[in-house]
Amino acid sequence: MSGHGTPIPMTSRRASPLKGEAHVPGDKSISHRSLILGAMAVGETKISGLLEGEDVLDTAKAMQAFGAEVVNHGGGEWSVFGVGVGGFAEPENVIDCGNSGTGVRLIMGAMATSPITATFTGDASLNKRPMARVTDPLALFGAQSVGREGGRLPMTIVGAAEPVPVRYEVPVPSAQVKSAVLLAGLNAPGKTVVIEREATRDHSERMLAGFGAEITVEDTKEGRVITLTGQPELKPQVIAVPRDPSSAAFPVCAALITPGSDVLVPGIGLNPTRAGLFYTLQDMGADLTFENPRTEGGEPVADLRAKYSPDMKGIEVPPERAASMIDEYPVLSVVASFATGTTMMAGVKELRVKESDRIDAMAKGLRANGVTVEEGEDWWSVEGCGPEGVKGGGTAESFLDHRIAMSFMVMGMGAQNPVSVDDGSPIATSFPIFERLMGDLGASIIRTDG
């Protein structure tokens, strides 16, 4: 059930301490990329631990529409039989990417340098999000696009019949834009160069290299320079998807604010471009440790242990950390509510164009639950109420955003009074087992729809 279905109101209340192991789903970023790169390789790519949320399943359907064979063997085990770089067929129908900004932007890139036409749409939330940030660089390859006003979905992309390689400096830190350009560069002759002034998550670069693409990454004075040689033959891979750090954030943060809690979250991907939240929590004084660090599939992995942390202090989050934790600011702001002192989060303008305007959405919901929040265009601050000091008792609007809904469910686990959201249905897009997993740890989340 996602943002285009019947609303599911939910309420979370303080229950017992949270105890046990939380096995969160596979990483969303790596799941999308595994399916897309598998479809562009020649032969069978085997994937285990795939996140089977709605967003990723929409990407799997899209790869089938472009001619790849995608097989679900059950238990998170999947196969993709790829058609090779430049081998995409023209889809017969509109590609519906649901709630997934990652899915639609990466797929647009992957097809933009093939001589085919495809039309993309999404749910009410996705159809409000800006796509020009992707279609502008794709136009440099020779692709054409026609969409609604402001570069929004539904949108038709006419791929370039004779693509040219591109040198592109990404104007705002965005792994989605960078990845779309790199995927487009796969089917352009010559070298495509992407320059990032601020490093973002690097799963695409790591995975492209793993699939056999010729790609180099160099840190220079002008930023991170990524060079990709076009028209390789990608070789199929066996991929074990690490567990998603953005999903791990919820049981971790819930344990920190719920008295008596001790939770282990095993097998979490700790790619340095994704782990900013955990370092920030440690800076605040959280009892959070990394156990059994190891490398799996080229990605750093560890088990996270989080315990109730009544001594957390508000801090100024370094703005340069923003790209490595952009999806985690909503739940960080909940933890900040239970700290002592003020937490300042700056350099976060990107939050205003996520699934919702996340600064606005969190500020409204926090205030409804007795927390003082200030905000500017690219910053916001949360005044901590101290451990067990958050009143709660309010209802937050989720704005069709899975992370907003889950963040307020976490808040209810530590607040004095129950916390509600108007619609928890979007949670299924990234974390379909959220309610069950948190309930197994001892949380009380109930659906209140009659």
Swiss-Prot record:
PROSITE patterns, sorted: EPSP_SYNTHASE_1, EPSP_SYNTHASE_2
Pfam families: EPSP_synthase
GO cellular component, one term: cytoplasm
Gene Ontology molecular function terms on file: 3-phosphoshikimate 1-carboxyvinyltransferase activity
Record field: catalytic activity: 3-phosphoshikimate + phosphoenolpyruvate = 5-O-(1-carboxyvinyl)-3-phosphoshikimate + phosphate
Binding site for 3-phosphoshikimate: K28, S29, R33, S174, Q176, D327, K354
Chain spans, region Disordered: 1-26
Alphabetical keyword list: Amino-acid biosynthesis, Aromatic amino acid biosynthesis, Cytoplasm, Transferase
Annotated phosphoenolpyruvate binding sites: K28, G101, R129, Q176, R358, R403
UniProt pathway annotation: Metabolic intermediate biosynthesis; chorismate biosynthesis; chorismate from D-erythrose 4-phosphate and phosphoenolpyruvate: step 6/7
GO BP term, pick one: aromatic amino acid family biosynthetic process
Catalytic residue positions: D327
Subcellular location: Cytoplasm
Domain of life: Bacteria
Record-stated family: Belongs to the EPSP synthase family.
The protein's role, per its UniProt record: Catalyzes the transfer of the enolpyruvyl moiety of phosphoenolpyruvate (PEP) to the 5-hydroxyl of shikimate-3-phosphate (S3P) to produce enolpyruvyl shikimate-3-phosphate and inorganic phosphate.
Subunit structure: Monomer.
Stated name of the protein: 3-phosphoshikimate 1-carboxyvinyltransferase
Gene that produces this protein: aroA
